[in-house]
A protein has these predicted regions:
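Intrinsically disordered or highly flexible coil/loop and linker segments, enriched in small
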Residues: 40, 44-47, 88, 121-122, ...
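A helix-coil-helix interface module used to build multimeric assemblies
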Residues: 1-95, 101, 105-111, 120, ...
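Generic secretory/membrane-interface signal
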Residues: 4-7, 113, 123, 147, ...
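Glycine-rich anion/phosphate-binding loop at the beta-strand->alpha-helix junction
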Residues: 78, 82, 126-175
Length: 175
């Protein structure tokens, strides 16, 4: 009787929405922490001169703080994107095999979604429309691309022939 009147997607899509919403909450928390750390370092190094590069070739001087300020702003934009994507993916449905509520009252969908911290999909078929998921995962790809870019830059700056940044080594640390 637990499944009576429902389609599997009513359960699975609604569950996926909860998982993605919670995942976004955790990622946002970590991104806020990262953003704040980058901001702190940007101010700390706002007057530290470094060489600006164009296609890896020395171009003009800039400050390390400016480089970090660029990362800060990009992270702020990524946070905005992820918050929007979190809101757009947080939709559930309990509307039956083809979304017509033929075997379940629409008030059930509203009640369940509210209890789960979701919004009812305004219109659906058997599934919550996948553009919501596509937007969410595209946003994650943008965030991951930024993090990859930051990590690659740090790795480049630590190269022996560049050595403009260095990992802190504690006594006895290897590697």
């Amino acid at each position: 009787y637990m499944h009576l009147g429902l389609t599997s997607s009513d359960v699975l899509d609604t569950t996926l929405a909860i998982q993605l919403k919670e995942s976004a909450r955790l990622i946002i928390k970590e991104l806020v922490s990262f953003r704040d750390a980058v901001k702190e370092q940007a101010f700390l190094h706002k007057n530290l001169p470094t060489i600006g590069r164009s296609h890896g070739i020395h171009a003009e001087p800039l400050t390390f703080g400016l480089k970090l300020a660029v990362w800060y702003e990009e992270t702020c934009r990524n946070l905005e994107r992820l918050k929007r994507a979190k809101d757009r993916v947080a939709y559930g449905q309990i509307s039956g095999a083809v979304g017509t509520f033929s075997n379940v009252d629409p008030s059930i969908e509203e009640y369940v979604c509210k209890k789960l911290g979701l919004k009812p999909a305004p219109v659906s078929t058997q599934i919550v429309q996948r553009d919501r998921h596509a937007e969410f995962f595209t946003t994650l790809a943008i965030v991951a691309g930024s993090i990859d870019k930051f990590a690659t830059e740090i790795r480049h700056l630590q190269r022996t022939e560049v050595l403009e940044a260095e990992e802190f080594f504690s006594r006895g640390q290897k590697g």
